[in-house]
């Protein structure tokens, strides 16, 4: 019996020992799944004792204690059943091959999944047009800083999945590996920050965490201004507007109104440039940098419209920083051929000073002056096509440095395999440009002028590397221009069809004609000759090709063909828009080939099968391409007009239309009816906005690092300063976060009501600011600042300085000094860690020392 008592005593002692070990572990309950930020430190209660770090009792320790106890008990020769219970018989041992299939594998992991996507309008909400971004690294760290899962986003979805996160674990998610031209996106309904905190659920649970990123060169707000060039007949010594702006949402949506005047809204323009300043232009490019917002326009040869003061090779630059045009000047003048216009553009075409008739302006069209303009993605280099010498020019936008040129390829590959050089080098005519991912895309055609064989008509797109100044050896895309495109004009009575099929270029006046029903004695006319005038890209990399009809620049509206005839001609152009699908392997499918339908509704009812003038723009993230067009309004009897159409790239439908001019009611003819009366189109998108801020948290272990499970601190006022001046303040939310955005940011109206957002005036790129937090404010009066920059990165860089506390103490204020990056460089790494003051007790035991021995 005494052994039993001793045994019970020993077992009880062991149990007490085990309980003391267990209760000695000071544990903390982590926030629930995805809500690590939703359990902030309560600022309204008494001072909080510092929360200890999580500690775990190793099962091995407890097992050792119990095992030793069992040995002791066994050594006493006692049956365990006498003390506690009768242990059941153990199950039969199973060999590997005899493991029952019905026993499921234990699932102990949870998942975090999501996408990293390109946020074109930087609103933190993903649209179905915003693609995934591949090659971004997403990593989960546990409380010890150990990687528990990592993945890299894949193309084309931008998806990642972290599959090995222990169930119930709190982790820190870091997003790294952003390319130089990619910046973290803004916070929003579909976007976290590059550092986030998640507590996963039980085994098999899945948490979703998405992140937006921004490519500043592709950013555009929802309703940017667009600009286009307009043409007026004759000498350009007038105040007629020849470059005008209009908002992206101009005009009306077909099917929503039968009032044609709805398609004229707005009828006024904020940005206008007059004819006497720039003359006739086609190519337009736009530069947006923190220092400048400027529009470039290149001189263009239209037979019935004169040049500006800079002549055939002029490139004009206009300040468009505000919503009205500023000063216009000549950036540079290229050698682009002689001006062959005469003294009178409408009737006699006489040259100066002899007064002899001029006939060679016809052939100069498409061969003199400049074609398209485009600009590098960094805004530092302007590209221009010289139609006279076939050169692609690189021009520094700041006016400094040399202007360099490279002749486009003229030894073009054969149209058919093995055909050799099917295009006479003298028939190679470049015109259109596009820029994407550092490469320049140059559009050109084989005009078949020397052979006059339509089978030789061909389109080519070559890539050019501006760094190495080399063209690719083979075209990125080429295809024959042999489609049956219907009729430029048709009617049933009398049966008439002016063919829209592309024709070889011709050096003298040539036309298909039909009597005009509206103007007796005058002739409707067309003779489509292709110029590949513009290249745009869809979000998936597919190319959109704008073809301009040379005939529309050779013949005017109700104008004679030459000084030797009184017959008046009304030109009807036969331009086109084609879609070359991305093939998924870095190439493009021929427009209209299998799997790449071309169904743009670029017609005017049954009268005209083609209405495009070739100039166009596509704003990233938008489903439409905006293209210049004659008779743009799809309503009856809206003819002899010029304007723009918005074509849906998936359906080909006309999503929107806007009329800029009508030649119907002009007392003196100034515009071009159904001819080429408009040039290129460009979007004047703003600079990508900037958002800064992020998190104040309780640094429980004092290491200056944001560890998973450490609590956020809400209710803290944060101030933004620049040059010692207060710009605004925000108050941290329950998740400890704060943010600042500029009042010009398009998302600012939706953020003004959120207390953790400070909407300020003056948050811009490449400037120095300070985040300040008064440490004496009530919300954090019992806290001190934790160690700063413990990762040895004090740059406050938005891609590298991610997880430590960045503030230093200046007096009684926590201060983070930082510089904003370029446009779109959102910075969510400006974090502040706080330590709670330890509560200290003083004193010891007071007792009556009866024997006076001090013990």
Write out the residue ranges for each language-model feature.
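Feature marks short, highly hydrophobic, charge-poor N-terminal signal-anchor/signal peptide-like helices
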Residues: 1-8
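Alpha-helical transmembrane segments
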Residues: 12-24
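Extracellular beta-sheet/turn segments enriched in Thr/Pro/Gly and aliphatic residues
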Residues: 96, 102-108, 190-216, 792-838
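A short, Gly/Thr-enriched small/hydrophobic beta-strand-prone motif that recurs across taxa
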Residues: 104-125, 687-705, 717, 829-831, ...
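Beta-strand signatures of extracellular beta-sandwich domains
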Residues: 115, 137-141, 174, 695, ...
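Short, acidic Ser/Thr/Gly-rich low-complexity loop/linker segments typical of extracellular
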Residues: 120-128, 132, 142-164, 704-707, ...
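A short, solvent-exposed beta-strand micro-motif common in secreted/extracellular proteins
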Residues: 137-140, 167-188, 747-780
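Sequence/structural signature of beta-propeller domains
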Residues: 158, 177-689
């Amino acid at each position: 019996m005494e052994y039993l008592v001793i045994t019970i005593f020993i077992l009880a002692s062991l149990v007490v020992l085990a309980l003391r070990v267990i209760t000695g572990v000071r544990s903390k309950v982590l926030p629930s799944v995805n809500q690590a930020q939703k359990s902030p430190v309560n600022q309204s209660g008494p001072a909080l004792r510092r929360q200890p770090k999580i500690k775990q009792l190793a099962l091995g320790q407890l097992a050792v204690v119990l095992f030793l106890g069992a040995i002791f008990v066994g050594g006493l020769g006692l049956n365990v059943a006498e003390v506690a219970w009768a242990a059941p018989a153990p199950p039969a041992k199973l060999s590997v091959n005899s493991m029952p299939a019905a026993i499921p594998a234990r699932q102990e992991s949870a998942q975090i999944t999501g996408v990293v996507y390109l946020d074109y309008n930087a609103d933190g909400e993903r649209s179905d047009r915003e693609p995934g971004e591949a090659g971004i690294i997403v990593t989960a760290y546990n409380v010890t800083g150990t990687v528990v899962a990592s993945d890299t986003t894949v193309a084309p979805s931008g998806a990642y999945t972290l599959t090995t996160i222990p169930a119930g674990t709190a982790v820190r998610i870091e997003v790294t590996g952003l390319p130089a031209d990619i910046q973290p996106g803004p916070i929003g309904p579909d976007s976290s920050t590059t550092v986030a905190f998640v507590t996963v659920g039980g085994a098999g649970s899945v948490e979703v965490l998405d992140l937006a990123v921004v490519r500043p060169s592709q950013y555009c707000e929802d309703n940017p201004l667009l600009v286009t060039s307009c043409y007026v007949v004759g000498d350009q010594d007038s105040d007629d507007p020849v470059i005008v702006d209009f908002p992206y949402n101009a005009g009306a949506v077909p099917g929503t109104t039968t009032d044609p005047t709805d398609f004229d809204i707005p009828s006024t323009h904020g940005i206008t440039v007059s004819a006497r300043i720039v003359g006739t232009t086609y190519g337009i490019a736009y530069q947006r940098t923190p220092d400048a917002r400027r529009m470039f326009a290149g001189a263009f040869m239209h037979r019935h419209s004169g040049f500006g003061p800079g002549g055939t090779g002029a490139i004009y630059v206009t300040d468009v920083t505000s919503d009205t045009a500023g000063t216009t000047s000549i950036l540079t003048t290229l050698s682009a051929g002689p001006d062959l216009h005469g003294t009178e553009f409408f009737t006699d075409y006489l040259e100066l000073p002899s007064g002899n008739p001029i006939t060679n302006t016809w052939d100069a069209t498409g061969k003199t002056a400049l074609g398209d303009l485009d600009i590098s993605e960094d805004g530092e280099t302007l590209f221009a096509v010289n139609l006279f010498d076939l050169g692609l020019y690189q021009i520094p936008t700041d006016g400094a440095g040399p202007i360099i040129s490279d002749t486009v390829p003229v030894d073009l590959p054969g149209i058919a395999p093995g055909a050799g050089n099917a295009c006479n080098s003298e028939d190679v005519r470049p015109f259109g440009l596009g820029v994407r991912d550092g490469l320049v895309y140059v559009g050109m055609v084989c005009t078949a002028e020397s052979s006059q064989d339509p089978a030789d008509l061909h389109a080519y797109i070559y890539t050019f590397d501006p760094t190495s100044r080399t063209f690719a050896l083979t075209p990125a895309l080429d295809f024959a221009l042999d489609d049956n495109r219907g009729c430029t004009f048709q009617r049933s009575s009398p049966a008439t069809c002016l063919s829209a099929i592309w024709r070889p270029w011709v050096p003298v006046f040539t036309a298909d004609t039909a009597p005009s029903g509206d103007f007796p004695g005058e002739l409707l006319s067309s003779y489509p000759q292709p110029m590949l005038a513009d290249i745009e890209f869809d979000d998936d990399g597919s190319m959109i090709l704008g073809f301009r009809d040379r005939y529309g620049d050779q013949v005017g509206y109700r104008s004679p063909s030459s000084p030797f005839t009184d017959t008046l001609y009304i030109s009807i152009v036969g331009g086109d828009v084609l879609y070359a699908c991305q093939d998924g392997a870095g190439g493009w499918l021929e427009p209209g080939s299998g799997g790449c339908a071309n169904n743009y509704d670029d017609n005017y009812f049954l009268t005209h099968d083609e209405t495009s003038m070739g100039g166009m723009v596509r704003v990233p993230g938008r489903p439409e391409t905006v293209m210049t067009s004659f008779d743009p309004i799809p309503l009856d009897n809206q003819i002899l007009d010029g304007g723009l159409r918005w074509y849906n790239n998936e359906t080909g439908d006309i999503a929107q239309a806007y009329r800029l001019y009508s030649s119907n009611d002009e007392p003196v003819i100034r515009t071009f009816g159904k001819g080429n009366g408009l040039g290129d189109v460009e979007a004047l998108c703003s600079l990508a906005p900037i958002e800064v801020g992020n998190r104040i948290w309780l640094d429980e272990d004092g290491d200056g690092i944001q560890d998973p499970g450490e609590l956020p601190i809400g209710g803290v006022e944060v101030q933004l300063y620049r040059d010692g001046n207060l710009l605004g303040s925000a108050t941290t939310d329950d998740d400890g976060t704060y943010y600042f955005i500029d009042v010009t940011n398009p998302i600012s109206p939706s953020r003004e009501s959120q207390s953790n957002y400070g909407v300020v005036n003056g948050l811009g790129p490449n400037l120095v600011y300070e985040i300040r937090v008064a440490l004496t404010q009530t919300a954090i009066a019992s806290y001190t600042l934790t160690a700063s920059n413990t990762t040895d990165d004090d740059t406050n860089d938005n891609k590298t300085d991610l997880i430590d506390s960045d503030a230093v103490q200046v007096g009684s204020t926590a201060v983070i000094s930082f510089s904003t990056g370029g446009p779109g460089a959102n910075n969510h790494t400006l974090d502040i860690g706080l330590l709670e003051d330890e509560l200290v007790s003083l004193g010891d035991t007071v007792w009556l020392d009866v024997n006076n021995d001090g013990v």
